[in-house]
Amino acid sequence: MPYIFAFFCTGFLGAVVGANFPNNIQIGGLFPNQQSQEHAAFRFALSQLTEPPKLLPQIDIVNISDSFEMTYRFCSQFSKGVYAIFGFYERRTVNMLTSFCGALHVCFITPSFPVDTSNQFVLQLRPELQEALISIIDHYKWQTFVYIYDADRGLSVLQRVLDTAAEKNWQVTAVNILTTTEEGYRMLFQDLEKKKERLVVVDCESERLNAILGQIVKLEKNGIGYHYILANLGFMDIDLNKFKESGANVTGFQLVNYTDTIPARIMQQWRTSDARDHTRVDWKRPKYTSALTYDGVKVMAEAFQSLRRQRIDISRRGNAGDCLANPAVPWGQGIDIQRALQQVRFEGLTGNVQFNEKGRRTNYTLHVIEMKHDGIRKIGYWNEDDKFVPAATDAQAGGDNSSVQNRTYIVTTILEDPYVMLKKNANQFEGNDRYEGYCVELAAEIAKHVGYSYRLEIVSDGKYGARDPDTKAWNGMVGELVYGRADVAVAPLTITLVREEVIDFSKPFMSLGISIMIKKPQKSKPGVFSFLDPLAYEIWMCIVFAYIGVSVVLFLVSRFSPYEWHSEEFEEGRDQTTSDQSNEFGIFNSLWFSLGAFMQQGCDISPRSLSGRIVGGVWWFFTLIIISSYTANLAAFLTVERMVSPIESAEDLAKQTEIAYGTLEAGSTKEFFRRSKIAVFEKMWTYMKSAEPSVFVRTTEEGMIRVRKSKGKYAYLLESTMNEYIEQRKPCDTMKVGGNLDSKGYGIATPKGSALRGPVNLAVLKLSEQGVLDKLKSKWWYDKGECGSKDSGSKDKTSALSLSNVAGVFYILIGGLGLAMLVALIEFCYKSRSESKRMKGFCLIPQQSINEAIRTSTLPRNSGAGASGGSGSGENGRVVSQDFPKSMQSIPCMSHSSGMPLGATGL
């Protein structure tokens, strides 16, 4: 029962909602002219609708450039309860319309020029033209051209073209002709003629475009050599007969393809319709704006039909509202209509009609039309995915190799080590046999795989290929291909965008990048105290402080702990009732114990108390880890001679000024830094272009010589392959540091559309997969190198230590021995002076006593004495005699009073 009840409730609510959906939908219309073709197309489209709901128009004729009148008409229609408004705008009124639509949630469907807005309630029927226009300019390889535009339709297309021009280094002259008079047109084209500007883009609406083209014909700027690109979607709407007769080249875009099935059917219905409000209009070929108007009506019809099927209530019961209210009250159902409009998709007069989340056309196709002296033809199409796709030609490159084998091809190249070099005895050979090198063998391998005969020819000007900025002519090997003087270029020719526009490249046969060449630094010899290098100086300082700290703590612990004190054994004759306590860990013994433990040699005394043993244990653990770590690193530091390079990367170069750096004066490396937007490379370019003296060199050889003679004060930036090759050439004093700054490749070039492109490309891929390319590079870079392998000889140098590696240890040994002898002398002198002062009289010390003093300080005790007896205890715990030396106890002395010799008891 609950399910049945819910089912009936749902059905009842759906019926109520469906009943509330209006059968008649009021829609607004704002048109600039009642007799316009767009107005008639609007009426015709409404007459073709058969499914409910019925769309009832509220049409106003308005001056679309007058903001006040547009505001009044817009608010008037909104107050009448329209659900959506169809209309046109201009630059002066577009901001007002988008503002009202966003505030009131009223949808505005327009075929006017697209605007860059985030307002989702403005549905733009006209596709955007920016990307398609840029693709066509790229297709024709324009570098310098004039851009004529009408500011009334906005500046979005111009802004996109200027941004691209900055990226691709185009030279664009923008001219606004909004207020240009007939005299102004004459002066404009005279000025362009003086500057030899014959490539022109015209960005205007159809009415103004026809006027401009009329002026061009009147001024006779439509002859052979002129090329105009019309940034307009109605190429077939424009009268170009005068251009066809005079020989100018005109290219444009066509949105409506009248030969397609749907446009042809609709056009037939349009012509045969007997609707009274559009019989006075010529329907032979409607303008593209009229086609957009027709599709706009269908968009609204599809959206409201979808809302009706979904039973969404959009009725405006008492919700007409006031668009001038402050604050503005948005229409609650406006968002539902906006979503329904954006979800519409169908095939219309203008092709696929579909919108993105911003209300702009997407997934559309533009037909590219070209008119020459021989007539009008479609040269391709443009869409968002494929960009510009040229029309198919009869000849397909690479389809048949039979013609390739019937002639001898010219292979242009350049003398550059190790790619192409003259043999030492070249005069004894003829033809291709005079040359050797990487590219010579590569050309032979490719010819073998493709199956053609060839002849190597060195390019006459010795250049790779660049376009002259004044004459626009190509030089070098690229020029040889462009102007048909060569068929293939096999050389270290970098694949770049500007070259790819005029010639075809194969897949890269070698990858490379910009690298840094410096003079190879001398290997750093180990210092006298290199044995200290395994640990940082901070660690050594911490070890010293730890040693002192442990010794002091051990001394204090031994003094405080009662278990560290012990009684001395008594000598004969002493009072045994007196207890004499001793402690072996004085401050000097504590230092000695810590030093012995650190040196892992041990000591003849050890702590007796638990606290003292804890101190000793943690110190032993500490020294175990430190000594083990030191030993592990010692071998590497003593046996390896390092080359300390002052530069390791481009960042190191950029942040210093002591070492100069530069590139080839004219080449792709210099262009890379000039065009780079990366902060580090921009900083490097700023330095290079302002450095005095100049850091640029004319040839790679000059850069190499400058590096070798600069004593490490100059770094040369060049392609990594050449850097690696020079590193293997005598005198072996240069080296490559750091990684590559960019990534590019060398390719084999052929003229545009050459039948060799496909076979050559396949040959390069096959050689790469077979490892032939790697073998060739290894042969000409390393096998024929003059400096040996990078790691050769390193094992012999690291197997034995030289005296310089351990000289510091010997210095410390000698210094320690000398210090010990000096301290012994000081001890002897100090003790002798102390003993002599203690005597109360003038004593004559015989030579025998001196000898005994030098011999030892520990003398045999009396037989009655204990093992450790005596009246005093030394620092190390041994018992010593109070009198030094002991033989002095029997030294005869002269009394001051009697002058008689006295015994020891007389002292």
Swiss-Prot record:
Annotated disulfide bonds: C75-C323, C732-C787
Region (Disordered): 857-881
Reported function: Ionotropic glutamate receptor that functions as a ligand-gated cation channel, gated by L-glutamate and glutamatergic agonists such as alpha-amino-3-hydroxy-5-methyl-4-isoxazolepropionic acid (AMPA), quisqualic acid, and kainic acid. L-glutamate acts as an excitatory neurotransmitter at many synapses in the central nervous system.
Compositionally biased region (Gly residues): 866-875
Extracellular topological segments: 19-536, 631-805
Cytoplasmic side: 558-584, 604-609, 827-907
Keyword Transport: yes
Protein name, UniProt field: Glutamate receptor 1
Keyword presence, Ligase: no
UniProt record, GO biological process: behavioral response to pain; cellular response to amine stimulus; cellular response to ammonium ion; cellular response to brain-derived neurotrophic factor stimulus; cellular response to dsRNA; cellular response to L-glutamate; cellular response to peptide hormone stimulus; cerebral cortex development
A molecular-function term among this protein's GO annotations: peptide hormone receptor binding
Lipidation, S-palmitoyl cysteine type: C603, C829
Positions occupied by motif PDZ-binding: 904-907
Similarity remark: Belongs to the glutamate-gated ion channel (TC 1.A.10.1) family. GRIA1 subfamily.
Signal peptide boundaries: 1-18
Membrane topology per record: Multi-pass membrane protein
SMART domains listed in its UniProt record: Lig_chan-Glu_bd, PBPe
Keywords on record: Cell membrane, Cell projection, Disulfide bond, Endoplasmic reticulum, Endosome, Glycoprotein, Ion channel, Ion transport, Ligand-gated ion channel, Lipoprotein, Membrane, Palmitate, Phosphoprotein, Postsynaptic cell membrane, Receptor, Signal, Synapse, Transmembrane, Transmembrane helix, Transport
Subunit record text: Homotetramer or heterotetramer of pore-forming glutamate receptor subunits. Heteromeric assembly can be the result of both receptor subtype and flip or flop form and according the composition, one partner can be dominant with respect to the fast desensitizing current component, whereas the other can determine the steady-state component. Tetramers may be formed by the dimerization of dimers. Found in a complex with GRIA2, GRIA3, GRIA4, CNIH2, CNIH3, CACNG2, CACNG3, CACNG4, CACNG5, CACNG7 and CACNG8. Interacts with HIP1 and RASGRF2. Interacts with SYNDIG1 and GRIA2.
Post-translational modification: Phosphorylated at Ser-645. Phosphorylated at Ser-710 by PKC. Phosphorylated at Ser-849 by PKC, PKA and CAMK2. Phosphorylated at Ser-863 by PKC, PKA and PRKG2. Phosphorylation of Ser-863 is reduced by induction of long-term depression and increased by induction of long-term potentiation. Palmitoylated. Depalmitoylated by CPT1C and upon L-glutamate stimulation. ZDHHC3/GODZ specifically palmitoylates Cys-603, which leads to Golgi retention and decreased cell surface expression. In contrast, Cys-829 palmitoylation does not affect cell surface expression but regulates stimulation-dependent endocytosis.
GO CC entries: AMPA glutamate receptor complex; axonal spine; cell body; cell surface; cell-cell junction; cytosol; dendrite; dendrite membrane
Pfam annotation, one family: Lig_chan-Glu_bd
Annotated glycan sites: N63, N249, N257, N363, N401, N406
Record PTM Phosphoserine, positions in chain: S645, S710, S849, S863
List of residues binding L-glutamate: P492, T494, R499, S668, T669, E719
Free-text note on domains in this protein's UniProt record: The M4 transmembrane segment mediates tetramerization and is required for cell surface expression.
